[in-house]
Amino acid sequence: MKRTIKVFVGDEARLVGTLHYDGVGTRERSAFAYDETWLGAADRFALEPGLPLVAGPQYHRKVPNGSAFHGAFADTEPDGWAKKVILRDHAKRRQEARRAGNEPKSVQLQTIDFLLAVDDASRVGALRFQDEDGVFCRSTEAGRRTAPPLIELGHLLTATRAVETETETAADLAYLRGRGTSLGGMRPKCTVVDDDGRLAIGKFPSVNDERAVTKGEVLAMQLASASGLQVAEARLVDSDGLPVALIRRFDRTANGGRIPYESAATLLGANPAGSQEHFYTEIVDALRVNGTTPQSDIEELWRRMAFSVLITNVDDHLHNHGFLHVNRGQWRLAPAFDINPFPERIRELKTWISPETGPDATIDALLSVASYFRIWLSRAKAIIGEVERSVAGWRDQGHAVGMTEAELEPFATAFEHREREIARRV
């Protein structure tokens, strides 16, 4: 399969370049070339450090566990839950075609199919893809909202539960098409329109949950805000008696405009097929090169590390850190998101603090890199103290969120542990 896709940026649809895809079975590759008008624009910027502003094609080959595209494009691909919905929808359509006596054309979906299955209106960041017919991929169909209002949460929840339990109908999948396929992550979720008309992410409880996960995430996000972190706005809403975490999208302006976004994995050029570990100190280095306000973002990153250590937020991989474009290739740290307490997990960070500390989620590891972050030791200790005092109120904050003692208790070991005691003595 060969495809040629035009790449645009923003609501004004400015042409950035052309993406060429060539795939046969598991052998997939792509090439991106900036358009000469973009290269000549006064406000041009590289979509990522791995795609410098040069003329001509820049190639990328798919690697195991990776994408066929450069990181800037791969960051907008569906994975986890969204990929599952797309695969189930594809299988259901093939079944229906056979029942109608038609042999389906497509047997296996390729990376390009997933990239273009994301709805244009709710795709993460500001990149937009236009097919060979000049149509923006997965644009809103006439008379159909791809990002539904909150009033439809019940319908969304019913459809996602059907997919989870493998009892979905063609109607369930048709409803989720474009609605439940624009976001990454493993848990069931969907883009929705909040009461004020802005985009948000609705995160649903899973049928496999053994604790109140959605409530726990909102608790963590609100604790993070109380600890001085810049975080995505989060609250709980009720849908037919079930708690849905509603997270405000930060890649949109107040009036709905798109903001370019990239993950820390893309900023660092991380190879998903490699066994190499990555470190917060690498993010510090990247901010010093590419950041618009590097030192304030570096201190913010330090505060986030302290918070993660104190609440056992150990799913802090590079795709759970992001950046928003400001101007001419300068980026700022995006608000914190996907923060969760994990009481059942070993206290080891996915992103190591530094090569020397390893995965240890400890106060000692934090303090050992204070000078690398250019934070005075006294200031580093003060930040740890501020965060610890906020985390100490986790039960009260949980009650404010609406959690019962029975719902809070399974989270206790994520908040009450030796590092909290050490933080109090710092």
How does the language model describe each region?
Residues M1-L318, G322-V426:
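Phosphate/dinucleotide-binding and metal-coordinating scaffold of catalytic cores
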